[in-house]
């Protein structure tokens, strides 16, 4: 599901809210989440999951086209860990 599909879905479920209002709300939520991660904060949404940053050590990688070694610098990457409730909802074996 893309961001625009999410917005359309939310508008379809609640006709009293305008598309522009939903679009602004979704954009604002995503912007606040991005800013929180940018400042090093952890985001926890109970029942859904948590977003945090993971530090990646510098390492040597390979260019898949040429096979040449490439030095990759250390960096922080966003990480999502699904909450228990979300894991249970998507578990098709349960």
UniProtKB/Swiss-Prot annotation:
PANTHER family: DNA-BINDING PROTEIN HU, INTEGRATION HOST FACTOR SUBUNIT BETA. Signal peptide: none annotated. GO terms for biological process: DNA recombination; regulation of DNA-templated transcription; regulation of translation. HAMAP family: IHF_beta. GO terms for molecular function: DNA binding; structural constituent of chromatin. This protein is one of the two subunits of integration host factor, a specific DNA-binding protein that functions in genetic recombination as well as in transcriptional and translational control. PROSITE patterns: HISTONE_LIKE. Keywords: DNA recombination, DNA-binding, Transcription, Transcription regulation, Translation regulation. InterPro entries: Hist_DNA-bd, Histone-like_DNA-bd_CS, IHF-like_DNA-bd_dom_sf, IHF_beta. Heterodimer of an alpha and a beta chain. It comes from Mannheimia succiniciproducens (strain KCTC 0769BP / MBEL55E). This is Integration host factor subunit beta. It comes from the Bacteria.
